[in-house]
Amino acid sequence: MTQNRAELNRNLAQMLKGGVIMDVTTPEQAKIAQDAGACAVMALERIPADIRAAGGVSRMSDPAMIKGIQEAVSIPVMAKVRIGHIAEARILQAIEIDYIDESEVLSPADDVYHIDKNQFDVPFVCGAKNLGEALRRIAEGAAMIRTKGEPGTGDVIQAVRHMRTMNKQIRELVGLRDDEVYEAAKQLAVPYDLAKYVHDNGRLPVVNFAAGGVATPADAALMMELGAEGVFVGSGIFKSGDPAKRAAAIVKATANWQDADLLAKLSENLGEAMVGINEDEIQTIMAARGE
């Protein structure tokens, strides 16, 4: 990937800012997401809640199923590959997917190395729990970062924790003297030029979305309040009582997160939310993958 291509990919991801990306498993769901105002959809065979419930090994989705979703909608389509699985990423690039998510939701293929995303033309999305993880993924070529949260739970606490941690570490880096950034880069285990960028600009060099446990318009507004530049919603929509209404409400809440009166209206009569799993009831399985 040339420097120009890397810049283009980052700018492509910037265009999703302020939007909602929804997990979908069928062309029908993709159309519901598009009609609700989603800025992109994530095509996968099983949503995270079902992956968590079923256990076993979770892999890249069938390309035929992904193509069906690509044909059904005009908005960008993303798909997930296992951490470190270069061949799955090549397959998705071959079918002209718009973005690849190297995702901890699927079973990791490599417990040491992530994909060298600089070898690909397609932009990559990666998860991160803290600033060090985010900058390492960006060094590998990621064009977009999202919090890991704990997918499939409907419990937003981990996404909140990861976003707060990342932004706290950014503020700490900004407050350093120029000559202290070298040591900070060493402690974070990241390239100096990326640490210096954060120090100078007070933000990541790529967009940073919230993901993991977002299930209500209020959850989406909370993540925007905490500094997210957009939101991924996985199980929270199509595991709920009225997916179309909830999807549209979350899109509007993300765009108007400071308008409490509108948020109150959007939260009314949405049908039953996904049941969810409290963080204390589970082992953290997915968020810890791929550091």
Curated annotation (Swiss-Prot):
Cystine pairs: none
Enzyme class: lyase
RNA-binding is among the record's keywords: no
GO annotation, biological process: amino acid metabolic process; pyridoxal phosphate biosynthetic process; pyridoxine biosynthetic process
Record's keyword terms, sorted: Lyase, Pyridoxal phosphate, Schiff base
GO molecular function, one term: pyridoxal 5'-phosphate synthase (glutamine hydrolysing) activity
Record-linked Gene3D superfamilies: Aldolase class I
The protein's role, per its UniProt record: Catalyzes the formation of pyridoxal 5'-phosphate from ribose 5-phosphate (RBP), glyceraldehyde 3-phosphate (G3P) and ammonia. The ammonia is provided by the PdxT subunit. Can also use ribulose 5-phosphate and dihydroxyacetone phosphate as substrates, resulting from enzyme-catalyzed isomerization of RBP and G3P, respectively.
Protein name (database record): Pyridoxal 5'-phosphate synthase subunit PdxS
Taxonomic lineage from the root: Bacteria, Bacillati, Actinomycetota, Actinomycetes, Bifidobacteriales
Gene name as annotated: pdxS
